[in-house]
Amino acid sequence: MFGGVNVYAAIEFSGASDLYFFLFFMLLKTLREEVLEANLELVRRGLVLYTFGNVSGMDRGEALVAIKPSGVPYADLTPAHIVVSDLAGTIVDGALRPSSDLATHLELYKHFSNIGGVAHTHSEFATAWAQAETPIPCFGTTHADYFQGPVPVTERLSEAEIAGDYELETGAAICRTFAKLDPNSIPAVLVAGHAPFCWGASAAAAAHNAVILEYVARMACHTLAINTESRPLARELHDKHFLRKHGRNAYYGQVKSQ
């Protein structure tokens, strides 16, 4: 709700607030559609089963977060189902309960100032690494193209953290893991005993990184199955591949037109 009005369903405008109301309505409409599409990308790529997982997106200008509702099958989702909250977790618009992981997403948005999307899955291979409480090593340039280092794993949550505000504490554990790491250079983490979270500049970018994470997690498993003594990629080659794509002087891809 916004000012007591369901802005997604609203079709009439009145008074001097017409323009603001319309612009806000369009902002939420666009954000919801982007978040829905990112959630459906997880389905298309085989990263989620049933109602597993969730993707959110944030509008930094309005400090609003849109996220998949809790327990709703992907096949049933429409933009109107996407729930919008502020950074305090107060529902701004939407009739359904938000994902139970909302508090984790909000912690990441609060602490990682450059991100605009968060994706959480229980994809098979990335989750296996999380359950093994083992960082995903970089064995090759595919990993290096997206993550400038091993994908880290959080510490285990304490009994008190689990019994308390569990989802918020999960987010806090992720943020502690990145106290000395750059979340822009390694846009993913494995939550110990749980599953991965990924992020990016948008909901679509977060979902994209979740797809790539699962791919490199699977390749790392296969690499170790072939050779248990496989060595991580040389630091020089690792940095070369990451920086040619994401660095200040990146030259991968096409020059954007002005």
Give the ranges of each region predicted by the language model.
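Short hydrophobic alpha-helical segments enriched in small aliphatic residues
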Residues: V7-A9
